[in-house]
Amino acid sequence: MTKKIYDIVPVPKPRMTRADKWKKRPATARYWAFKNEVKLRGINVPEMGTHITFVMPMPASWSKKKRAEHLGEAHQQKPDVDNLTKALLDAIYEDDAHVWDIRTTKIWGEVGRIIIEGMESNE
C-alpha cells in the first residue's frame, strides 16, 4: 500500500454547458485549471483498492476555536464527494470505466489537499 499526498485544493466537476467552450465561467475556469494541475503533477489513481481523501480548506473567516473543532472532521457540505471524485478521475483518465474499486472521504483541514492511498498500479 502506498500513500501519496498532493497539495492541490480539490475542485468539483461543474455542470457543463455548450457555451463553456468559448465563454469561461469562474466554476469551469477553476475546473480546467485543476485538470491541468493534476496532469502536470502526474497524479495516478490505481483501478482497484484505492482510498481517496479530499481535504477541504476551512474558510479564513472561521475562529481558531471553530477551526480546532472541525479539523479532521467530516466535511458534510457542498461540493459533493461524487463531483470531486468525478473531477479527479476525468483529469487523470480519458475513460475512467476501468476504475472499479474506489473509496472516497471528504474531511476538513487547514489547507486543501488530495491524499491517495492504494495498491501500486502496473501502469
Annotate the PLM regions.
Residues 1-123:
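Acidic, proline/glycine-enriched N-terminal capping motif
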